[in-house]
């Protein structure tokens, strides 16, 4: 909000599925109203919305493969954010570029890839918003967590009260692993 009227640097949140973030005309299942919400909160940060490749969404947002759905190119997508997009954003805008001030948010498959990114690359992403994550896509996500190094990343999990039982149990399972394996999570 105050970007044009100051010379301060701002934290950055990278959000997946940009088609759904700002405009109901471009959204698949309803606008998230990110801009309206941040204005109401008077939040001083930069949001970078990353559009998905439509029929490539499953490939882009899944770090593991699934026998039925395929996927598995998520690391390439995350690497694009780290090696190409983030450096460009940091060079064009006044950002606070350290991990503490860089977050990654998403829902469903976007939640899965956000979780993966913050666990695999905590030196880049210090925070993650993981909303209704598709942990069902592959059990490898649990192995990843168990094998990961100690992290000071902050992870915010969210799922709605109308989610199916699998979503809630998957989130609780992951929260237990995170609590046991050294991560700082805001509770469900």
List the predicted regions and their residue ranges.
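Non-catalytic cap/lid and distal C-terminal segments of serine-dependent acyl enzymes
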Residues: 1-188
């Amino acid at each position: 909000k105050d970007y044009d009227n100051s010379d301060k640097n701002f934290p950055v949140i990278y959000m997946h599925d940009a088609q759904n973030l700002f405009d109901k005309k471009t959204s698949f299942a309803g606008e998230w109203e990110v801009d309206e919400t941040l204005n109401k909160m008077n939040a001083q940060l930069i949001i970078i919305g990353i559009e998905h490749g439509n029929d490539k969404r499953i490939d882009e947002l899944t770090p593991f493969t699934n026998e039925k759905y395929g996927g598995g190119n998520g690391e390439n997508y995350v690497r694009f954010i780290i090696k190409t997009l983030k450096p460009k954003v940091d060079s064009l805008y006044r950002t606070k570029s350290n991990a503490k001030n860089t977050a990654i948010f998403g829902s469903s498959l976007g939640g899965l890839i956000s979780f993966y990114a913050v666990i695999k690359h905590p030196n880049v992403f210090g925070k993650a918003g993981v909303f209704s994550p598709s942990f069902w896509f592959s059990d490898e996500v649990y192995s990843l967590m168990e094998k990961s190094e100690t992290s000071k990343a902050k992870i915010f999990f969210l799922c709605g009260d109308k989610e199916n039982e699998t979503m809630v149990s998957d989130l609780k399972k992951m929260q237990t692993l995170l609590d046991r394996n050294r991560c700082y999570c805001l509770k469900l």
